[in-house]
């Protein structure tokens, strides 16, 4: 064995990789291995050639830093350098003053614009939302990471991130609490008010949900404040505020399903879109509720959720269920939820603890302290609980007395069955409605007290009681109308004809009672508290009176005419807020004109 190889074997394990290669190894592109600070290396020693090292080092590739154009885009107005903004970090102030990657805002943090940049020869790739930070108020959650910059810019340009001034937000939220929240108490008002009104550090809400709340509050807000916002009419304000929330939903800005579900329930209050009406948004809400398993009782499975979270889920579920039933009763649209799809227990008073705001938040909203009394909370909670129980009966009535038919290629509506149900089934459902009415507590009984309400709490409770009885009377009308109008007997029972006459009388009684309630609310200035489901109730009652006035047999024609006129005045008062009221008024006007000319 040559000596060189013996040396190689002897040196094996003591050699180290060279920090700099010799000229021979560099030319042959070999690895240069030698002792520290000693020559020759192993390769040169084995080949018996000179080994020398020149002072040449491989230069490290310098990292590419930000170019001047990007550095300029990172600066805000005033020449100060913008620090990286963490979208999940809570700012110290209520509004931001700078945005990363060239987006800037004003003091309110709602209007954003992009600084001018010199265009390059090639379009730059759009970064994802993970490298983009939109400046939003501190009380709303940050920008999701999955949205592209072009999507966020489009949302910003269309005003999806624009919020009303703080004072107008206060009035909008107050309007929501007084008119919408008692009808659908799915919001955790304590968290919402702590974030938006009190600006508590660490409290945030969803931008999508906040925009939806702004839209719902604009339905009942005083027109003076709508004009201060720059809108010429309530319809324009509702359309604009709804459009902002709809853009955020369609672009997937919100990722938390509960916020999306709450917003979808508020979307059902918008009726002007023919393609995406209340029934469409209700279907979206039901699909999302199934996705998160809202229809299941989590008490039957071991979960790590607190009692307040379980109460919130129950309230949210029954709001979805009740809204589905009331929309089916009002618009004849097909129900999305079947009675066998859920096993959530009925609500209790303990489930409503977190749906009321704190006293400090109510004072900031200039709301009466009576809204936080135990009596007010109990009355509003019981009203919704009994409305939920009535909604279960509404589903049974619609499934038994009506069948689904196609009104158009994209619309399915309820129509009376060609053959009514048997007399025993009919009497069973009527008995269930009577049991529901007799089980009402004293503070929800009918008729309403004659004394007009004075405080805000009394007005809200009074209006909610009135709406509850209007829904009950509308359900009676829906139960008896197919039975009284059917010409085919279902059995040979001699009492069947008498029950048909009784059904006709109950329809007339229910219609007259609906108009009396609406007239009384109109006389004391509470028409503004009526929900959208009051419009179909008024329409069915007025149609009954039109038929009665046009019949040959008239009982108290003057009283019928007075009820009709008063119902018409109440319907006119709802035209500004609801598209349904405008269509109903046009239908009544066309019907009366046709009867006069015919």
Curated annotation (Swiss-Prot):
Residues 22-51 bind DNA. PROSITE patterns: ZN2_CY6_FUNGAL_1, ZN2_CY6_FUNGAL_2. It is found in: Nucleus. One of its GO terms (molecular function) is DNA binding. Disruption phenotype: Has no significant effect on the synthesis of 2-oxocyclopiazonic acid, cyclopiazonic acid (CPA) and their biosynthetic intermediates. SMART domains: Fungal_trans (SM00906). Keywords: DNA-binding, Metal-binding, Nucleus, Transcription, Transcription regulation, Zinc. This is Transcription factor cpaR. It comes from Aspergillus oryzae (Yellow koji mold). The lineage of its organism: Eukaryota, Fungi, Dikarya, Ascomycota, Pezizomycotina.
């Amino acid at each position: 064995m040559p000596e060189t190889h013996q040396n190689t074997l002897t040196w094996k394990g003591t050699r180290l990789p060279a920090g700099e290669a010799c000229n021979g190894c560099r030319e042959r592109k070999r690895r240069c291995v030698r002792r520290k600070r000693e020559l020759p290396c192993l390769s040169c020693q084995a080949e018996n050639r000179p080994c020398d090292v020149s002072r040449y080092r491989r230069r490290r590739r310098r990292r590419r830093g930000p170019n001047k154009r990007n550095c300029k885009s990172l600066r805000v107005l005033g020449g100060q350098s913008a620090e990286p903004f963490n979208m999940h970090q809570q700012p110290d102030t209520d509004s931001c003053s700078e945005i990363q990657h060239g987006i800037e805002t004003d003091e309110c943090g709602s209007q954003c614009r992009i600084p001018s940049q010199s265009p390059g020869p090639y379009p730059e790739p759009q970064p994802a939302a993970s490298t983009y930070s939109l400046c939003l108020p501190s009380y709303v959650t940050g920008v999701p990471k999955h949205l592209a910059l072009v999507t966020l810019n489009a949302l910003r340009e269309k005003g999806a991130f624009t919020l009303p001034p703080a004072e107008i937000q206060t009035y909008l939220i107050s309007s929501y609490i007084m008119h919408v929240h008692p009808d659908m108490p799915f919001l955790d008002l304590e968290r919402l008010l702590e974030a938006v009104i009190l600006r508590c550090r660490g409290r945030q809400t969803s931008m999508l949900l906040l925009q939806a709340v702004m839209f719902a509050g604009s339905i009942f807000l005083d027109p003076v404040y709508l004009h201060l916002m720059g809108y010429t009419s309530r319809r324009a304000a509702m359309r604009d505020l709804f459009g902002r929330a709809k853009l955020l939903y369609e672009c997937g800005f919100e990722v938390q399903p509960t916020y999306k579900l709450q917003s979808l329930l508020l979307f059902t209050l918008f009726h002007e879109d023919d393609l995406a009406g209340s029934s469409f948004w209700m279907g979206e809400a039901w699909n999302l509720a199934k996705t998160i398993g809202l229809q299941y009782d989590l008490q039957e499975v071991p979960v790590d959720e607190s009692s307040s979270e379980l109460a919130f889920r129950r309230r949210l579920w029954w709001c979805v269920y009740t809204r589905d039933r009331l929309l089916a009763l009002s618009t004849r649209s097909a129900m999305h939820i079947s009675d066998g799809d859920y096993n959530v227990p009925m609500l209790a008073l303990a489930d409503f603890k977190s749906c009321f705001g704190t006293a400090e938040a109510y004072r900031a909203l200039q709301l009466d302290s009576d809204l936080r009394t135990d009596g007010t909370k109990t009355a509003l909670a019981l009203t919704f609980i009994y409305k939920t129980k009535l909604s279960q009966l509404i589903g049974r009535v619609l499934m038994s007395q009506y069948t689904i038919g196609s009104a158009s290629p994209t619309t399915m509506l309820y129509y009376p069955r060609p053959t009514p149900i048997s007399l025993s089934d009919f009497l069973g459902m009527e008995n269930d409605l009577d049991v529901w009415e007799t089980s009402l507590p004293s503070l929800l009984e009918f008729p309403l007290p004659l004394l007009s309400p004075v405080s805000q709490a009394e007005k809200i409770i009074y209006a909610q009681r009135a709406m509850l009885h209007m829904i009950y009377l509308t359900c009676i009308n829906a139960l008896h109308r197919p039975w009284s109008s059917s010409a085919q007997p279902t059995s040979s029972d001699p009492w069947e004809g008498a029950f048909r006459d009784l059904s006709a009388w109950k329809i007339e009684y229910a219609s007259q009672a609906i108009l009396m309630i609406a007239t009384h609310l109109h006389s004391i200035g509470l028409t503004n508290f009526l929900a959208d489901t009051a419009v179909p109730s008024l329409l069915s009652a007025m149609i009954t009176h039109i038929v009665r006035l046009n019949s040959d047999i008239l009982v108290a024609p003057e009283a019928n005419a007075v009820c009709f006129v008063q119902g018409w005045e109440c319907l006119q008062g709802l035209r500004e807020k609801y598209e349904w009221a405008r269509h109903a008024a046009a239908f009544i006007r066309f019907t009366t004109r046709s009867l006069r000319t015919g």
